[in-house]
Swiss-Prot record:
This is Probable GTP-binding protein EngB. CDD domains: YihA_EngB. Pfam families: MMR_HSR1 (PF01926). Transmembrane segments: none annotated. GO terms for biological process: division septum assembly. It comes from Mesomycoplasma hyopneumoniae (strain J / ATCC 25934 / NCTC 10110). Mg(2+) binds at residues 51, 72. PROSITE patterns: G_ENGB. GO terms for cellular component: cytosol. The keyword Transferase does not apply. The lineage of its organism: Bacteria, Bacillati, Mycoplasmatota, Mycoplasmoidales, Metamycoplasmataceae. Necessary for normal cell division and for the maintenance of normal septation.
Length: 198
């Protein structure tokens, strides 16, 4: 009986994957990296849509989202149907948190990006309406200095015009960084992002 249930569960899982339904799951929240497997890291300022992007990739709501910045304050780990790990890092630059909390978040981020971490690639997410900020430039310099592969994801392009998007792409070109314009909300260009995650 148990074998039959397992068989039907495996068939159901296979059909979900075959039909394009993402089989993602939340693993755990940690103040430091609690896994040694290769992983993709998502980082950005508070409220740029990191958690919304995780949900869009998973095709279901597995990450908690909020209109209030600073919701994510730990490392949140997820795994997809291919057993790949994804990490949603705390957002930086939110002024309305206490200095103690800000220092804690800074320590978590700095601790995660140590040179010996098993990070396959880092995706720094921007709010396309705002563009690059000084804090983004500092974070970009730090990640590159640590030797990690970096991609820029300009999110919320559904709320921008062609001129703003052209400026963003030109800024990325000057920085010599790969930049992808996306909308986690409308799922624009998520298929191109999926290719980078292969």
């Amino acid at each position: 009986m148990v074998k039959c249930k397992l068989f039907f569960w495996l068939i159901s899982w296979f059909l979900k994957v075959k039909n394009g339904e993402k089989v993602w799951k939340f693993l755990r929240s940690c103040p430091e990296n609690c896994y040694s497997d290769p992983q993709f890291a998502f980082i950005g300022r508070s409220n740029v849509g990191k958690s919304t992007l995780i949900n869009a990739l998973a095709n279901k709501k597995i990450a908690k989202t909020s209109t209030k910045p600073g919701r994510t304050q730990l490392l949140n780990f997820y795994k997809n149907e291919s057993e790949k790990l994804f990490v949603d890092l705390p957002g930086y630059g939110y002024a309305a948190v206490s200095k103690t909390k800000k220092d804690q978040i800074d320590r978590i981020i700095a601790g995660y990006f140590q040179k010996d971490q098993p990070i396959s690639a880092v995706f720094l997410i921007l709010d396309a309406r705002v563009g690059f900020t000084n804090l983004d430039y500092i974070m970009i310099e730090y990640i590159i200095k640590q030797g990690f592969k970096l991609h820029i994801l300009a999110n919320k392009i559904d709320k921008t015009n062609q001129s703003t998007r052209a400026i963003l792409l030109n800024q990325c070109k000057k920085l010599k960084l790969n930049c992808l314009l996306i909308s986690a909300k409308n799922k624009n260009n998520l298929s191109k992002l999926q290719e980078l995650l292969e």
